[in-house]
């Protein structure tokens, strides 16, 4: 007799960055602890783009064509110090970083960390304690450069894997695999307007992604249409999340003083979309710290492949080829 599959509960949380990075990490921890006690409890939570470290909306850093200001450089100092150090190398150590094979890396709690600032270990601890697979956007510093990044934190064995964007390595587009409640999930992320890059999207579809993550800072009404298109193209579940906050929540260094304005700087707009493009939850507007949760059946991805598989039967790979430097885009095992 066929059994009904147990639903996988997916969630997006549009929390906003707080005044300091330790405060933001603590807020993430509290949100996950609270969610773990919920009914239903999410199996996976996605937090927004640059949630840890902050998205510097409205900041010009004193820059115009041909000129920089001392005040702008001071802004950058503040922003740089809010970024986190995950212990990777500037060129990206890949699997060596994941497996803790770099000099100074070791298993253990934050007090024994000799590489990085302990953020990786804090996130792994939260995942272990709550049993929730955590995916969050963050701003990472490596050497003298900042990167907009996504980190995946699996609750099993404290493992984590990180995806760097911007000037990161093309090999970091590799999808991540995990099992939740016995269900095989292949997940990958594209940050903000990277989702407008058709070849990048196709590199993820080619890896047979069934959970597509899109942390963003785009609050335009057109964003939902893009997320529905991605879900239909990839025949995958799509989670998109954006921060929601008012001007008074922005850091003082951004404008020189703390604003008292109650106007929204970012209205959110987080959503969850099915493999056939149906909006399951959202978009969630003007709800600071709001969270959406929905139970899904990943067999819906297979049901969608009956008539469309853009990286398979529809791809015409006899005529078109996509190669990504340093990346194997075949589905991960």
Residue ranges and their predicted role:
Residues 121-134, 195-292:
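CN hydrolase (nitrilase-like) catalytic-core segments centered on the catalytic cysteine
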